[in-house]
Amino acid sequence: MRIDALALRNFRNYDALNVTFAPDCNVIVGENAQGKTNLLEAIVYLSSAHSPRTRADRELISFGKNEAKLTAQAFARSRDFLLEVSLAAGKRRKIFINKVPAKKGSDLTDVLGAVYFCPEDLLLIRDGAAARRRFMDDALCQLRARYAQALSDYHRAYEHKTRILRDSEEYPSLLDTLPEFDLRMAQSGAVLIYYRARFCERLGEYARTAHRECSGGREELGVTYQTVSTISDPLAPIETI
């Protein structure tokens, strides 16, 4: 797969950008704070419908603007694709693949895959659990469509629950709907826990082999996934978590 061209409008620091890429390796150079990372962020967003730097799509829209658009011409699976994402403040984003509305953001991953590396990756070790969850979310949303859907469902239920708790003092009857959203969060959360545990298990296998080679066989590296204390076995079937 490859990206042949990219167009941005009102995305981060770009009022308008149109760029074409070589079919092989491309090197992006420039002064600091000129938008190199923003360009890479746009490519990642077009491959996953998620930014590796923020969870709020509003932050991707240029300051003082109300909407943004990302467009890419890509080649994958022996055919051409046109990927389009429109962002608008206070509205749901719109995603089109070859002018056809996408049912979900993970449909982009079926066309374009991207791996994003940055200096902040060191925060996986130095920072708290939130950075590690974000890393797994970004990877698994591209690898497993079911995970991407579960993550979206979880956040949606969480936002509903937050609004209910916020407004319950004025409208106490809203509290009657809390169990429904608790159930939705539990169901989606079970899917997230299962896939994260499997991801860490596979990652540990590769990391163990690589570290053994780097240390000349003198050291062993292990990766384990620890979730909430009420989950005794995160690798158990989803229905039992």
What is each stretch, according to the model?
Residues D15-A16, T20-F21, V44, R53-I61, ...:
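Phosphate-binding site recognition
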Residues M1-Y45:
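Pre-Walker A-like glycine/lysine-rich segment at the N-terminus of P-loop NTPase domains
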Residues S48-A131, D137-Y147, G204-T209:
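Nucleotide-state sensing region of NTPase/ATPase domains
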Residues D15-V19, R79-L83, L221:
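Short beta-strand segments
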Residues T227-I241:
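Small-residue-rich helix-loop
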Residues A88, T224-V228:
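Short loop/turn motifs enriched for small/polar and acidic residues
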